[in-house]
Regions:
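Short, solvent-exposed turn/loop segments enriched in Gly/Ser/Thr/Pro and often Arg
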Residues: 59-66, 148, 184-193
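Hydrophobic alpha-helical membrane-insertion signals
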Residues: 29-86
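Active-site cores of enzymes that catalyze phosphoryl transfer or operate on phosphate-rich substrates
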Residues: 2-5, 10-15, 86-158, 163, ...
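CE4/NodB-like, metal-dependent polysaccharide N-deacetylase domain
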Residues: 162-187
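Hydrophobic, small-residue-rich alpha-helical packing segments that form membrane-like cores
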Residues: 190-206, 221-224, 235
Length: 286
């Protein structure tokens, strides 16, 4: 039987949102939700595997805007305030649903989830999740790659200087947070244009991630399609995403996030609860 290699490559990005002029800002919640629902759980899985002697060997892209937000003291404090309010709400929900076993089980699950997230964020990672990811990379458990400075769509940038700045600033930001130069880059939106490999080679990057059609409609077409890295003229390797696998974790129609057995996104205490009950947990604008 033929054997192959599987590369699990994750990409983490959020637009930069930081508004110190307001006590709270709705779009900052995107970061707080991602910390609780994605970044801390990822660290838990990676660290658990490493403790068991299993090196995950997962590649993880962390973009410069996300790295800056995760290491920002203001946003770190605001996340702690945010998750503390969620813990308080969950405690109230555990008491409110005491006579409804199914709902009570859900409330207890969320109470445990947010309590653990708060404890890990404050005590294990000292509010900076970057340190957790950096330690995993230094231990050889994962490899972290970079991205464009602002996640800008490179093919639509008309000036080579702008494209070069995106790549070079992405490299410098990576060095700032991870104390070494990156080997790879997730091209913003996986968007390729002819000649981008030369800019990547200038930055010392050895591989990049693109969408499948960049390879499948290339000239000449690689013999193995997207199922092997493609070496570009500048000597930088291109890895294409597998379409079917991507849909399983991304598509609302065929992937697991859109399946009600995974989660019911339209059931929300904000709609179910009385206004006076949920008011302390809403933004000040209601």
């Amino acid at each position: 039987m033929e054997q192959g290699l599987l590369s699990i490559i994750l990409h983490a990005h959020l637009p930069f949102v930081r508004h110190p002029e307001y006590p709270e800002f709705l779009e900052e919640d995107w970061l707080y939700e991602a910390i609780s629902e994605t970044y801390i759980p990822l660290l838990n899985v990676f660290e658990g595997l490493a403790v068991d002697g299993v090196m995950p060997r997962v590649t993880l892209g962390l973009t410069p805007p996300l790295c800056e937000m995760l290491s920002d003291p203001l946003l770190q404090q605001r996340y702690l305030d945010h998750v503390t309010k969620l813990v308080e709400l969950c405690e109230s929900e555990v008491m409110r649903t005491a006579k409804h076993p199914a709902m009570n089980e859900t409330a207890r699950m969320y109470l445990n989830h947010f309590s653990a997230a708060r404890d890990l964020f404050e005590n294990r990672y000292r509010r900076n999740l970057i340190s957790g990811f950096r330690a995993l990379q230094e231990a050889g458990a994962i490899e972290i790659i970079t991205c464009g400075a602002t996640h800008g769509f490179l093919p639509l940038m008309t000036r080579t200087e702008a494209r070069r700045a995106q790549v070079q600033v992405g490299r410098l930001n990576y060095i700032k947070h991870f104390n070494r130069a990156p080997r790879g880059i997730w091209l913003p939106e996986c968007a390729y244009y002819t000649g981008v490999d030369s800019l990547l080679e200038e930055a010392g990057l050895r591989f990049f991630i693109v969408d499948a059609h960049a390879i499948m409609f290339g000239t000449p077409q690689p013999r193995r399609g997207i199922y092997a890295p493609t070496l570009t003229p500048a000597g930088v390797a291109a890895f294409a995403r597998d379409v079917e696998t991507s849909e399983q974790v991304w598509s609302a129609d065929t992937g697991y996030p859109g399946d009600p057995d995974y989660r019911e996104f339209y059931r929300d205490l904000g709609f179910d609860g009385e206004y006076d009950y949920i008011k302390p947990y809403l933004h000040s604008d209601g």
